């Protein structure tokens, strides 16, 4: 599950206030899809996930939070999706990162937003190099590291979480 702070940053970078369709690649149990659906009830969300256990939990979460605007697509991206998107979130690449970036750029409307999160430095490097190779301008890259207050004996300390890399970029053009 995408942690709350990472999810908030990713959703902000997706600029969903101007979107009508979001694709969530590697949706997992649906934390990003559910949060987006709750914040933007008019948004259509395509959640792609390959893991059967995660798909079951994703469907349970969709029902629990009454998010009828989430369509669940079992399988592996890239896949055929008829409708282009205004925003794509990639929370996992399954080892096909450059293929997924290429597919995302084809699947996005002009001026559409792509946001990706990584925990591995190698995936960050591959993504940045590939976006540069594609000529994508204005790539925004952040490292987010959040610490949470925890108890230690009779005292408290901030327990660090692992850092997460967030890349946000925009497809060239203007969406009408």
Q: What residues fall within each predicted segment?
A:
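Short beta-strand element of Class I
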Residues: 42-46
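S-adenosyl-L-methionine
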Residues: 48-89
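Active-site segment flanking the S-adenosylmethionine/decSAM binding pocket
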Residues: 72-115
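Conserved SAM-binding loop of SAM-dependent methyltransferases across substrates and taxa
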Residues: 29-41
